[in-house]
A protein has these predicted regions:
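Short beta-strand scaffold segments in enzyme catalytic cores
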Residues: 23-29
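A short, polar/acidic, helix/strand-boundary loop motif
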Residues: 31-48
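Short glycine- and acidic-rich boundary segments immediately preceding or forming the N-terminal edge
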Residues: 1-2
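Acidic two-metal-ion nuclease catalytic site recognized across multiple nuclease folds
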Residues: 142-146
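Extreme N-terminal starter segment of soluble prokaryotic enzymes
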Residues: 5-9
Length: 146
């Protein structure tokens, strides 16, 4: 996957307390430019996709979405989305794509913009920005908690 010229790096992460359970998502361009959100009942996979979706929605221009989710990164790096579209949102096993309600708008935005790429980063490995968005996503699982 080619990184668009002039791309800004946006780091994303999702978290869930229990799986399913309360979920949180976050994206950050820096430790001062970020957003996070909450879903009362979700899964870790849904929150990972939601983090990427919200990052792409919120940030114009060329983007490199950096995620520790192979689920999110592989969708675009390995072009899973192309097969899903060709098969009418069915997997290669002819089963409905899980989390289509989140994948569909994310895939549409990425295709429409044409200037978004994805990169995997190992989670919980001491990477400053990945650790930062992880902490934001975990905190977002329980908004208002001390």
């Amino acid at each position: 996957m080619t990184v668009p010229v002039g791309a800004r790096k946006v780091f994303t992460d999702g978290a869930c307390s229990g799986n399913p359970g309360p979920g949180g998502w976050a994206w950050a361009l820096s430790t001062t430019e970020y957003a996070a959100g909450h879903e009362a009942a979700s899964t870790n996979q849904r929150m990972e996709i939601r983090a990427a979706l919200e990052a792409v929605r919120a940030n114009d221009g060329p983007l490199l979405v950096v995620s520790d989710s192979t689920y999110v990164v592989n969708c675009f790096r390995d072009a899973w989305h192309t097969g899903w579209l060709e098969r009418g949102w069915l997997t290669s096993a002819k089963k409905p794509v899980a989390n289509r309600d989140l994948w569909e708008p994310l895939v549409a935005l990425v295709i429409e913009r044409g200037n978004v790429a994805f990169q995997w980063v190992k989670g919980h490995s001491g990477h400053e920005m990945n650790d930062f968005v992880d902490a934001l996503a975990v905190a977002a699982c329980f908004p208002g908690a001390p």
